[in-house]
C-alpha cells in the first residue's frame, strides 16, 4: 500500500509505504540511526536490504530522556567521523524519538542531507514519522528546538509491531484515538468496533491515520493553521512529561491524559457532551491508557502552558473536540475556567 504526501513541491513530496519494504538502493553513503533496543531486533535485517557505497550505523540509548542536543551532537560527530557527504542518506530505524532526532540531524548536517523513516512503533507509524517535524527537548519543554524537514520516504512495516510490549502498542493507540476524535467520527466507531489484534484491521488503522495526516500536512506543512489540531491533548501532555522528567509516562500515555483533560475543558465550554466525554475516556481505558494525573499545583501547571509552541501573544491555544469527529481551536478561554479543570485532577 502506498500513500502519497503531496506538499506541492517536487523536492518535498514523498510516499508512505505500508508493508512494502524491500531492497533499498542509494547513491553515496548511508548511516542507520537506531537505539540499543531496536538495533538488537532489526538492525541486521535492515542492513541486509541496503545497497550503498558504504553503510554505517549509529546506536544511541533508548528513551525520551536522551532526546536532547547532547545526543544530537554525538550523532553528528559519528557522521563526521564516517565522512558522510552531501549525497549521503540517514535512515531512522526506531520509534518517535529516533524519527525526530534523525530528521533533525539530517536537516542540519552540512545544511541538509536526505533521510528516510522506518518507524518500528505504532506511535511513530501513525504520527511521528510522517509530516517532517523534527527536534529535541530541553529543560524548558518538549520539542522546542527543531526544524521542519521532510523525509524522502517512509516505510511502515506492521511486522515490527509484533515485538512491541503491550504498553508501547497501547501508547500508539492514543495517537490513533486523537486522529479519529478530531477528524472522523466513522473512524472512531471503527476503532471501537474492531480488534487491533487482527493484522488487516491494524493495517487499515495505520493507513487511515497516515491519510488523515497527509491531508492535514498538505494544507499546512509548518503548523500555521490546521496542523495545530494534531496537537490535541499535547498542550497538557507536554507539561505532564516535563513535570515527570519524561520517565513516568510514555509519550502516548501522557497524550491520553492530555486528551481527557482537554475533553473536560471542552465539556465545560459546551463543545463536548458528557456522553461523548465518557465514550472517549472509556475508549482510552479500553487500550490500557491512563486518563488521570495528580496535579500538585494548578498555577504552576497553567504557567507551563506558555512554553507551548502554539501559544501566541500571551494567549494559550487549546485544541478541543467539538463533538467526536470535529474540532475547535480556542485562544479565548479565561484562566479561571482552565484552573477549574486542573483542580479536578488534584
Curated annotation (Swiss-Prot):
It is an enzyme of class 4 (lyase). NAD(+) binds at residues 62-67, 96-100, 120-121, 133, 142. It catalyses: 7-phospho-2-dehydro-3-deoxy-D-arabino-heptonate = 3-dehydroquinate + phosphate. Its EC number is 4.2.3.4. Its main location: cytoplasm. Its cofactor is Co(2+); Zn(2+); NAD(+). SUPFAM superfamilies: Dehydroquinate synthase-like. Catalyzes the conversion of 3-deoxy-D-arabino-heptulosonate 7-phosphate (DAHP) to dehydroquinate (DHQ). HAMAP family: DHQ_synthase (MF_00110). This is 3-dehydroquinate synthase. It comes from Campylobacter fetus subsp. fetus (strain 82-40). The lineage of its organism: Bacteria, Pseudomonadati, Campylobacterota, Epsilonproteobacteria, Campylobacterales.
Amino acid at each position: 500500500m502506498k500513500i502519497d504526501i503531496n506538499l506541492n513541491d517536487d523536492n518535498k513530496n514523498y510516499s508512505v509505504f505500508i508493508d512494502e519494504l524491500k531492497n533499498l538502493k542509494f547513491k553515496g553513503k548511508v548511516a542507520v540511526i537506531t537505539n540499543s533496543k531496536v538495533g538488537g531486533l532489526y538492525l541486521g535485517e535492515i542492513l541486509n536490504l541496503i545497497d550503498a557505497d558504504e553503510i554505517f550505523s549509529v546506536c544511541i540509548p533508548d528513551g525520551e530522556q536522551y532526546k536532547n542536543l547532547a545526543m544530537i551532537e554525538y550523532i553528528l560527530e559519528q557522521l563526521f567521523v564516517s565522512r558522510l557527504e552531501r549525497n549521503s542518506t540517514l535512515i531512522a530505524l526506531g520509534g518517535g524519538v529516533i524519527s525526530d532526532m534523525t530528521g533533525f540531524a539530517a536537516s542540519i548536517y552540512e545544511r541538509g542531507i536526505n533521510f528516510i523513516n522506518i518507524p518500528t512503533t505504532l506511535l511513530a507509524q501513525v504520527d511521528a514519522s510522517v509530516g517532517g517535524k523534527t527536534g529535541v527537548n530541553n529543560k524548558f519543554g518538549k520539542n522546542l528546538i527543531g526544524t521542519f524537514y521532510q523525509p524522502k520516504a517512509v516505510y511502515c512495516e506492521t511486522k515490527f509491531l509484533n515485538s512491541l510490549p503491550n504498553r508501547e502498542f497501547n501508547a500508539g493507540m492514543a495517537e490513533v484515538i486523537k486522529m479519529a476524535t478530531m477528524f472522523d467520527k466513522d473512524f472512531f466507531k471503527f476503532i471501537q468496533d474492531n480488534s487491533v489484534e487482527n493484522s488487516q484491521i491494524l493495517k487499515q488503522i495505520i493507513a487511515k491515520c497516515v491519510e488523515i495526516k497527509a491531508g492535514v500536512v498538505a494544507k499546512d506543512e509548518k503548523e500555521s493553521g490546521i496542523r495545530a489540531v494534531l496537537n490535541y491533548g499535547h498542550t497538557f501532555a507536554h507539561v505532564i512529561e516535563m513535570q515527570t522528567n519524561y520517565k513516568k509516562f510514555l509519550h502516548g500515555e501522557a497524550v491520553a491524559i492530555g486528551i481527557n483533560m482537554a475533553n473536560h475543558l471542552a465539556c465545560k465550554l459546551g463543545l463536548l457532551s458528557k456522553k461523548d466525554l465518557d465514550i472517549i475516556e472509556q475508549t482510552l481505558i479500553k487500550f490500557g491508557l491512563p486518563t488521570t494525573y495528580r496535579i500538585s499545583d494548578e498555577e504552576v501547571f497553567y504557567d507551563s502552558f506558555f512554553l507551548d509552541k502554539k501559544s501566541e501573544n500571551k494567549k494559550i491555544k487549546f485544541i478541543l473536540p467539538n463533538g467526536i469527529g470535529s474540532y475547535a481551536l480556542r485562544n479565548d478561554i479565561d484562566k479561571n475556567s482552565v484552573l477549574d479543570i486542573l483542580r479536578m485532577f488534584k
